[in-house]
């Protein structure tokens, strides 16, 4: 990215995620840095509600195919042509290919709805995470924002925030408190990371 250009993070999604709304804090001008924008929504589900959000906000969208994502060029050409230099995952369940990680080294982040390293890995997403937390009688849960590497939910932790797990909590109730943390912290962490990168 050349200095003076807008930093452009795409959002990769596959399942319903409250973070789509949170990320649009960038678009609504709620962040302190005006040069950050959601430049592209990348999705593997053509029926995903986030595509309607993208259309309403006039954000370009790219529907990706599994074979090309894993066995081809992982859409790197399209991302580069769009001027993408930072990738934000929000409910994207596919494992990120090594070729894409290398192409955007240190510029891909994810948010996980619990306190890693607990309750991470393949299959640990959405209500499955919250059910596991409650089943194991944890006293607190939270969110983890981390860099993406070749292993599910394994990259270097950037930020964590906690919330209590209350007696008689359901997975839905816990998820609601987690969503508050996601909306509160994800946009600002994204902003800080991009600002720090641009200042190097």
Task: Give the predicted meaning of each segment.
Residues 1-200:
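One-carbon transfer enzymes
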């Amino acid at each position: 990215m050349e200095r003076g250009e807008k930093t452009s993070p795409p959002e990769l999604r596959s399942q319903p995620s409250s973070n789509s709304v949170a990320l649009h804090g960038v678009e609504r001008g709620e962040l302190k840095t005006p040069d950050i924008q959601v430049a592209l929504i990348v999705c593997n589900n053509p029926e995903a509600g986030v595509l309607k959000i993208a259309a309403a906000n006039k954000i370009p969208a790219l529907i990706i195919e599994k074979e090309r994502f894993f066995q081809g060029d992982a859409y790197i050409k399209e991302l580069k042509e769009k001027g993408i230099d930072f990738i934000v995952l929000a409910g994207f369940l596919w494992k990120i290919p090594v070729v894409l990680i290398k192409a955007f080294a240190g510029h891909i982040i994810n948010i996980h709805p619990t306190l890693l390293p607990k309750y991470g890995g393949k299959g640990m997403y959405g209500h499955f995470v919250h059910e596991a937390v409650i089943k194991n009688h944890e006293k607190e849960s939270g969110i983890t924002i981390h860099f993406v590497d070749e292993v599910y939910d394994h990259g270097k932790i950037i930020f964590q925030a906690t919330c209590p797990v209350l007696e008689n909590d359901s997975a839905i109730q816990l998820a609601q408190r987690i969503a508050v943390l996601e909306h509160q912290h994800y946009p600002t962490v994204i902003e800080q990371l991009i600002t720090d990168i641009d200042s190097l």
